[in-house]
Amino acid sequence: MNHFPWLTIIVLFPISAGLVIPFLPSTGNKIIRWYTLGVCLLEFLLITYIFCYHYQFNDHLIQLKEDYNWISFINFHWRLGIDGFSIGLILLTGFITTLATLAAWPVTRNPRLFYFLMLAMYSGQIGLFASQDILLFFFMWELELLPVYLLLAMWGGKRRLYAATKFILYTAAGSLFILIGGLIMAFYNSNEFTFDFQFLINKKYPLELEIIIYLSFLIAYAVKLPIIPFHTWLPDTHGEAHYSTCMLLAGILLKMGAYGLIRINMELLPHAHSFFAPWLVIVGAIQIVYAALTSLSQRNLKRRIAYSSVSHMGFVLIGIGSITNLGLNGAILQMISHGLIGASLFFLAGISYDRTRTLVLDQMGGIGNSMPKIFTLFTSCSMASLALPGMSGFIAELMIFLGVIDNPNYSSLFKIIIIIIQGIGIILTPIYLLSMLRQMFYGYKFSNTLEPYFMDAGPREIFILICLFFPIISIGIYPNFVLSIWNSKVNFLLSNNFF
């Protein structure tokens, strides 16, 4: 166990600092905003310090391990650790949450609760990615639900209560299957039950039981990822949530399901994963095309972007199901890439709504002339979303594309069919994104006035978008550094469990 509890500090610091917010002076919102931003920035700097000085790139084992007996009666341990799968997502969480806090600057109604909930989400997300115990993983998974529900129900749009209720019902029901699967794994064929990932890796199950456990976890991840047909909560949630909340949902929350699929299903249940892998590839390919077609029919800007997220997460499913070095590396890169691109698109949709007061694409035409900066940034981020060469999405999707081809266990016919379906999805993506840009910026005038005028992006908004767009370009031009973060872990997982 590591002597200094770095991981415990970064998990508990945000929510602990959030408890101070009720005692801050009540003269306006300025102090609360700056305090929360300072906490998020300090947390991100701590994460960056741990990554730079304590994380070993070539070590595939769990690093900075911490193990404290929390509730001995049920053998509940506070087990934390990081490896290649988790550190990239922890960095993404710190980066996106800090920018989402800055994006929430205009929020003036009940700011104490709003910013506390954001910090509580921060702790839950870091805790989930650092968990090395199924019960702690479940605890952190559940910790996300209440903050998101309240952020949606209190600061959402007109149909916020419907969207919040749908979100909590879907995700809470799905969460139960994590607990069920975890309990079966802990108690099966063991005198002393444990939820420790490192112990459960070496545990063997009959294939039928392993498939049941795998399905139990998969149902929970299917809601969060999301996988069709469990995706219907996502467009409603994104359509009603404040755009800072949307940044956290698209940037981090969806990645929790994909992370669980790799961390638990792929690592702890490899035989069942080999059985289900072709089906994951098939569902992922169908999801890409289905969500792209559905996105094209959406008249609401945020719902269109939400369906594009569902489509892009289909690539992650294919990469995980490919069981190849290229495919799995590409899937993790796609998670990072989509986190940045999705957050930027929802932020742009939000600041566009702040100016036009509408999300209906048919009513947003002709605003490009009065908002050239937003137009330029929106176009650039849309190009990143459609995987333009030189941007992060292109590298990720190309690796996933090649990963399916690289799997020797899939027949040539299967590969050809999947490649054709992926190709259709890749063709549909620019259609719905470019039509969105045309309707917003090139379409008919917003009103009957000669030239509607809206204020363009300010310094704060431009700063947020540059911060998001810079890593998208950097990864697209030179992905080797980012891929090296988790490549050794990917190699170890595949060679140890599948080859």
UniProtKB/Swiss-Prot annotation:
Annotated catalysed reactions: a plastoquinone + NADH + (n+1) H(+)(in) = a plastoquinol + NAD(+) + n H(+)(out); a plastoquinone + NADPH + (n+1) H(+)(in) = a plastoquinol + NADP(+) + n H(+)(out)
Output a single Gene Ontology CC term carried by this record. chloroplast thylakoid membrane
> Does Transcription show up as a keyword for this record?
no
What is the annotated localization of this protein?
Plastid, Chloroplast thylakoid membrane
Name its GO BP terms in alphabetical order: ATP synthesis coupled electron transport
The terms under GO molecular function for this entry are: NADH dehydrogenase (ubiquinone) activity; quinone binding
The record's annotation in PANTHER family points to: NAD(P)H-QUINONE OXIDOREDUCTASE CHAIN 4, CHLOROPLASTIC, NADH-UBIQUINONE OXIDOREDUCTASE CHAIN 4
Q: What is this protein called?
A: NAD(P)H-quinone oxidoreductase chain 4, chloroplastic
Species name: Marchantia polymorpha (Common liverwort)
